[in-house]
Amino acid sequence: MEKWTAWEPQGADALRRFQGLLLDRRGRLHCQVLRLREVARRLERLRRRSLAANVAGSSLSAAGALAAIVGLSLSPVTLGASLVASAVGLGVATAGGAVTITSDLSLIFCNSREVRRVQEIAATCQDQMRELLSCLEFFCQWQGRGDRQLLQSGRDASMALYNSVYFIVFFGSRGFLIPRRAEGATKVSQAVLKAKIQKLSESLESCTGALDELSEQLESRVQLCTKAGRGHNLRNSPDLDAALFF
C-alpha cells in the first residue's frame, strides 16, 4: 500500500503534464482553424462583390449595346445624332466590360494570395500534428497495459491526426489547390477553393474534437487518481516526462 501511495503523485503528475501538452497543441490547431475560416469569409465577401460587379457590368454592356444598335439602325436617316448614339452606346458597353474584367482580375489576385496563405497554414498544421503524433505514440506505448478506455481514446486521437496529415499532404499538392484550366479565374474556381478550405477546416476540427475527448478522459483519470488513491493502476515511467517535452 505504501508503494502504491508513493507512485500515485507521480502518475497523476505525468497525466497532468500530458493533458497540459494536449491542451496547448489543441489550442494551436484551433487557431489555424480560425485562420482558415477567416480566409473562407474573405473569399465569400469577394465573391459577393464580384457578383455585384458582374451584374453591373452586364447591365452596362446590355444598355450600351442596345444604344449602339439603335444608333446604327437610325444612321441612314439622322446621320449625326444616330452616330453619336452609337458612340455613346459603344462607350457604355466598353465600360461594362471593363467592370467585369476588373472583377475577374480581382479574383485572380485574391485566389493566388489566399492559396499561398492556406498552404502556409496547412504546413504549420502538419508540423504541429507530427509533434502530437510522436507524443501520442509514446503515450499509447506507455499506457499499453493500463486503462483500456484511455488507451482507446489515445488511439482515436492518433487516427484522427493521421487522417488529417494525409489529407494535408494531398491538400498541399499543387493540383488540389490551383484551379484547373477549365475553371479559370472565375466565380466557379473561387467557390471550389472555398469548398476545399472548408474541407480542410473540418479535417482539423475532427482532430481538435478527438484531442478534447482524450483530454476529458485524462482529467477524469487524474481526479480518480487523486481522490480515490488509485494511482497504482496507472503505469508510470520516468521516460514519460522526458517525452512530453519533445
Curated annotation (Swiss-Prot):
Record's keyword annotation contains Magnesium: no
Q: Which GO terms describe its biological process?
A: angiogenesis; autophagosome-dependent secretion; endothelial cell activation; lipid transport; lipoprotein metabolic process; regulation of endothelial cell differentiation; regulation of membrane permeability; response to hypoxia
Which InterPro entries does this one have?
ApoL
Is Transcription included in the keywords of this UniProt record? no
Location in or out of the cell: Cell membrane; Cell junction; Cytoplasmic vesicle, Secretory vesicle
Recorded GO molecular functions are: lipid binding
Which GO cellular component term is one of those annotated? cell-cell junction
- What up-regulates or down-regulates this gene? In the brain, by electrical or chemical seizures (at protein level).
Q: What keywords does the record list, in alphabetical order? A: Cell junction, Cell membrane, Coiled coil, Cytoplasmic vesicle, Membrane, Transmembrane, Transmembrane helix
Entry coiled-coil feature ranges? 193-220
Membrane topology term reads:
Multi-pass membrane protein
Q: Please give the tissue specificity annotation from the record for this chain.
A: Present at low levels in brain vascular cells (at protein level).
This molecule's function is given as: Is a modulator of endothelial barrier permeability, required for proper organization of endothelial cell-cell junctions and cytoskeleton. It also plays a role in the modulation of secretory autophagy. May affect blood-brain barrier permeability.
Q: Which PANTHER family match?
A: APOLIPOPROTEIN L, APOLIPOPROTEIN L DOMAIN-CONTAINING PROTEIN 1
The family this protein is said to belong to: Belongs to the apolipoprotein L family.
Name of this protein: Apolipoprotein L domain-containing protein 1
Which source organism does the UniProt entry give?
Rattus norvegicus
Write the lineage as a comma-separated list: Eukaryota, Metazoa, Chordata, Craniata, Vertebrata
